[in-house]
Amino acid sequence: MEIRVIGRGALAGLVAGILGFLFAWIFAEPTIDKAIDYESGRMNVLSTVHTAMGHPVEPDGPELFSRSIQSGIGAATGIIAFSVAMGALVAVAYLVLHGRFQVRPKVLGWTTAGFGFLGVYLLPFVKYPSNPPAVGHEFTMEARGFLYLGMVWGSLTLLGLAVFAARKLSAKVGWARAVGIAVLGFFVLYGGLLAALPSLGDLAANVEHAGEFGFARAATETPQPITNTFDTPVTVDGKVYAPGQLIY
């Protein structure tokens, strides 16, 4: 039985992964391409300005995988593999919880999947939405990754604690009151987690780079338009930009 249930979960994940890749390929990849073009052009302008001012400019690293591979087989492999793994994990969670709650198997299955959706995607998304569509500020990539994973871990932990509390309290106050208390406690702790973690645009690295040319603080990690913040005109590709004028 266990192998069959896990296999069904993995199969459901496979179907979801294929649909997810098709959606990404049709709707998301064009936006990502535009974002990459924007960031590449922005970096070229910054390199030109820094070179003209005599500042050292680091060369671009080698491209390990072409954009066509990234948006094609790379995205397909990543999305489908992740979806299969998530489907199998939901099936394992279902097997662990089966028999511990007096609910029908179908209800338990949908509830387990729903809690997984909340903990892995929706609740972390409230604090750290998926932005930017390309790379964003390179100096915050590592911090963003750790913060997002921390938000996922915190969300799943709080959901687990809420279920545990509701189950323990149900014997004393009944299921309805137990669920109400657990939900209220969850939102209080979840609100504390949202307040405790730093917001995008306010990370330590953002503050550190606040005075650099071409950087502007914003409530996002998408690089902002470049403005001439110097007291003198700046020449880029033969065009002169006055102080305060938008360059790119």
Predicted regions and their residues:
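Juxtamembrane/disordered regions of integral membrane proteins
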Residues: M1-Y248
